[in-house]
Regions:
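Flexible glycine-/small-residue-enriched beta->alpha junction loops
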Residues: 109-164
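Active-site pocket-lining segment
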Residues: 160-162, 206, 301-370
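N-terminal extracellular/periplasmic Venus flytrap/periplasmic-binding protein-like
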Residues: 10-12, 22-32, 40, 174-286, ...
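Conserved catalytic cysteine-centered active-site region
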Residues: 24, 55-110, 152-159, 222, ...
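Beta-strand segments within the central parallel beta-sheet cores of soluble alpha/beta enzyme folds
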Residues: 46-54, 80-85, 110-115, 176-181, ...
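Conserved active-site "lid/cap" helical segment
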Residues: 1-61, 65-73, 77-80, 160-172, ...
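Active-site pocket-shaping loop/turn-to-helix segments
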Residues: 12-38, 57-59, 82-99, 119, ...
């Protein structure tokens, strides 16, 4: 197999829903990170062979968001670009597709990543074109419908997390402790400047001034498990408990401890946020690295995907990570750092149990519960965060990034530091 390298990567700071990035189009955010990633990689735009970029909420964003990103970033018209739509896995899927393009001999340098402005997702009238003659009409929230709603069981992603709670026996207290730890780690990392190297500033208008947005704004100070313990459950418990063994064999550890089985345990505090942001990754072949004298951050040594019952979509990373590690020829004991996207504390805990994570290596600077989850960008964002953290830790040689995907899927990638 050809050698595959991440030459450089970066991300925006993550904005809150309706926050600092609400008026910055997804394509604009994407262009900013692509331009900066190419600059850091010392790759001329004309040497890019293709751009592939994740974006889920594309309604009213204009044709092919990835092409907009490419042109706005100064990449020549002659370079093709396409938008990847694999729900939360879109940003990571773009990296997998970039790797495949290089392995196939179609490309030597590709730009991958993802962008999402959840704040800008429009409301839609589904019958206005042909049937809205008179009377009140319903508007559909495309942010929920296209990004956060299980199309197969007709309920919110939060209910899939409640399904996992019941099957894996995860308590409300466990989830609140997990969420509080994420917030505390993210606060410490942000305030100490741990994220500074991976973030590129985005100019935003505040009143009449243009200021640089470069600090993750969704992170909450002072969160403890006790401080969020009284929040009410946010999502209905699923009408039925699916059998996790239908597609794959899971250990389902802890199920015997389901003291609060059937109760609502997923809250606004132990679930990820609704957010805006973008991330970009420059991927190159070994030949391109040698030809242009590039200095890569890491080698991509394996990736994996997988599917599970949509009712328990949050455990998709278990299957994907096993496949990725098998392809890379490593075990979990070989992995020094893990970035596992925190869609919900429930699924994060289940994934950690099934994969036997050493939690001291997982999301060491917090995860999506604290930082936020701009859905089309998150798969790329966790790669950016993982690789930059590996650079700061001499002992970190190998890293795993993985995330769950609505509809019952997962993706994962394994890197080795250069």
């Amino acid at each position: 197999m050809k050698d595959l390298y991440v030459v450089n990567c970066c991300r925006t700071a993550i904005g809150s829903f309706g926050g600092s990035l609400k008026n910055t189009p997804a394509a604009e955010m994407g262009a900013i990170v692509v331009k900066e990633a190419l600059k850091r990689a010392n790759v001329a735009p004309e040497n890019v062979d293709e751009l592939m970029f994740g974006c889920i909420l594309t309604a009213a964003q204009g044709q092919n968001v990835a092409r907009q990103v490419s042109i706005k970033a100064g990449i020549p018209y002659s370079v093709p670009a396409y938008t990847v739509g694999m729900v939360c896995g879109s940003g990571m899927k773009s990296v997998i597709e970039g790797a495949r393009s290089i392995l196939a001999g179609d490309s030597d340098i590709v730009v991958c990543g993802g962008t999402e402005n959840m704040s800008a997702a429009p409301f839609a009238s589904l019958d206005a074109r042909w049937g809205a003659r008179m009377g009140d009409k319903k508007l559909v929230d495309t942010m929920i419908k296209d990004g956060l709603w299980d199309a197969y069981n007709n309920y919110h992603m939060g209910t899939t997390a409640e399904n996992i709670n019941d099957i894996w026996g995860i308590t409300r207290r466990e989830q609140d402790e997990f969420a509080a730890a994420s917030q505390q780690k993210a606060c410490a990392a942000r305030d100490s400047g741990r994220f500074d190297d991976e973030i590129v500033a985005v100019p935003v208008k505040v009143k009449k001034e243009i200021v640089e947005f470069k600090r993750d704004e969704y992170v909450k100070e002072g969160v403890t498990a006790d401080s969020i313990a009284k929040l009410k459950g946010a999502f209905p418990v699923g009408p039925e408990s699916p059998n996790p063994q239908v597609v794959h064999t899971f250990e389902v550890t802890g199920a015997q401890d389901a003291a609060d089985k059937g109760t609502q345990r997923v809250t606004a505090a132990n679930a990820s946020g609704i957010n805006d942001g973008a991330a970009a990754i420059v991927l190159a072949s070994g030949e391109a690295v040698a030809k242009y004298g590039l200095k890569p951050m890491a080698k991509l040594i394996g990736w994996g995907q997988g599917g599970v019952d949509p009712k328990i979509m949050g455990v998709g990373p278990v299957v994907a990570s096993r496949n990725a590690m098998k392809k890379a020829g490593v075990t979990i004991d070989d992995i020094d750092l893990v970035e596992a996207n925190e869609a919900f504390a429930a699924q994060s805990i289940a994934v950690a149990r099934e994969l036997h994570f050493d939690m001291s290596k997982v999301n060491v600077n917090g995860g999506a519960i604290a930082l936020g989850h701009p859905v089309g960008a998150s798969g790329a964002r966790i790669i950016v965060t993982l690789l930059h953290e590996m650079q700061q830790r001499p002992e970190a040689k190998k890293g795993l990034a993985t995330l769950c995907i609505g509809g019952g899927m997962g993706t994962a990638v394994v890197f080795e530091k250069c």
